[in-house]
Amino acid sequence: MGHKPLYRQIADRIREQIARGELKPGDALPTESALQTEFGVSRVTVRQALRQLVEQQILESIQGSGTYVKEERVNYDIFQLTSFDEKLSDRHVDTHSEVLIFEVIPADDFLQQQLQITPQDRVWHVKRVRYRKQKPMALEETWMPLALFPDLTWQVMENSKYHFIEEVKKMVIDRSEQEIIPLMPTEEMSRLLNISQTKPILEKVSRGYLVDGRVFEYSRNAFNTDDYKFTLIAQRKSSR
């Protein structure tokens, strides 16, 4: 197979298959055993080749699922208020949510301020992981006024929150005030997003408003930066 180390030759072959379109973004690679047989090498050599391609952001390894050709990062346009499902709708991929917490809690002083509610009001507290296929993409924690959504269900939060608000509740969403914060992931974030605790992530803190001025949610979203790119268009103000 030439003078290059075997693992680099295997990595080159896989890279060529991707370039020719034989392997497409999102495609699963054969198992390590199958690659061993195909190339006539040891499992250690196969793992070295795959690890190199993962480090080069060509492949991605999903724990408990396998190794895949890495898909293009999701473009998160800060000026477009769209749901997780809407951001991925043009890619025709499976998206789903795993709900970890679904409960009603009293509103402390902080939540009263963020949601513009009274001490007597209670709120929904929901935590969920958002997936593209089997890949955890984001960890979302949301608080919503119970008075606005007394009929919110676990099933709604397994799907699209915005679809429920707009299509079922017939409410009109106006805007979201957002703040993007770089931070180091907590142990929980690292575990749920399947990333290293030494890898920086981005957290989006937002407050959503209905067209009548009521706040319908306060949320915190932690994003795996391998899967997202944040874009905005800045126009220079004329000095005339």
UniProtKB/Swiss-Prot annotation:
Effect of a null allele: In cells lacking this gene the expression of mngA and mngB increases by 9-fold and 23-fold, respectively.
GO biological process: negative regulation of DNA-templated transcription; response to heat
DNA-binding region positions on the chain: 32-51
Alphabetical keyword list: DNA-binding, Repressor, Transcription, Transcription regulation
Presence of keyword DNA-binding: yes
Induction comment: Induced by mannosyl-D-glycerate.
HTH gntR-type domain: residues covered: 4-72
InterPro entries in alphabetical order: Bact_HTH_transcr_reg (IPR050679), Chorismate_lyase_/UTRA_dom_sf (IPR028978), Tscrpt_reg_HTH_GntR (IPR000524), UTRA (IPR011663), WH-like_DNA-bd_sf (IPR036388), WH_DNA-bd_sf (IPR036390)
Pfam family, one: GntR
Keyword flag Transcription: yes
One GO molecular-function entry: DNA-binding transcription factor activity
NCBIfam families hit by this protein: PRK09764.1 (NF007292)
Known function: Represses mngA and mngB. Regulates its own expression.
Name of the protein in question: Mannosyl-D-glycerate transport/metabolism system repressor MngR
Source species of the chain: Escherichia coli (strain K12)
